[in-house]
């Protein structure tokens, strides 16, 4: 966990989008590695490790043009030898470059959605698969997070990954990867501002600018401590066989770290402009892209919903679950994924 987040943090210093695409691919590959059968792992993982194939995870059904809250509607239809799939996924980072799409969907039935949810692997060139270029955004542009429209695509049984409800039983979460990305991007902005100031004596000698630099450096350090304290707790949870209290503590720490990383990265990426002045707004400087990327990516999931989970876990610890976010899918009236 710790090494993985250090890699994402360092990549995000250079480019938040690149770090996000690696995150998407590794998370999708990790889901296949964890939930696939031995036969599926033997088939698909060598294609990734040895063949360099990419997998994009596609779960969001938050239509950018919709006026209603996102509701998971993707559901398989039984067919001879497998299933039929029709769905429209949005915000699918890596979609344009991926060889496979790991589609979050569900088997038909009356049980809550989280108990029916599983994954299917859909090849990019499969029948009924269409990419929709709807990615015209403020930032995170190079993630090329196009829509994936799938119409009556046949999914053979060997491409169904996991058992129904497998994800809410999987102890892992994605939370800290976003923390690492936000933190790394903010560190990239801060280091660019430091380089700018070092080259200009009139700025480097300003007491006001020194105060701001010291303040931002301290905020970044605090966020880094929060990230790696939570990552260490995940190491403990894995080492103790995913004991529920230890696991839940890891996710609680991760949610708090994510909240602080969102706030800190937004603050840092804005205040570096005050340090550097109007020249920092030119596209020859990296700060404007970093700011746009941070402003966009920190909206990935509604922070207020995360903080509700933290508060509820503090007020009634027995109700907190590491995978509680995904059980919100069972309550359609609740906003489950503000993208």
Label every PLM stretch briefly:
Residues 88-130:
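A short core secondary-structure module
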Residues 222-260, 273-281:
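C-terminal helix-coil-helix/basic helical segment that borders enzyme active sites and/or dimer interfaces
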Residues 1-93:
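Glycine-rich flavin
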Residues 184, 214-221, 255, 259-266, ...:
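Generic structural signal for well-ordered, non-transmembrane alpha-helical segments
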Residues 276-339:
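Glycine-rich phosphate/cofactor-binding loops in nucleotide/flavin-utilizing enzymes
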Residues 135-221:
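Glycine-rich beta->alpha junctions and the first turn(s) of the following alpha-helix
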Residues 90-95, 174-178, 297-300:
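Glycine-rich phosphate/pyrophosphate-binding beta-alpha loops
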Residues 7, 28, 85-87, 120, ...:
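Buried hydrophobic positions in well-ordered alpha/beta secondary-structure cores of metabolic enzymes
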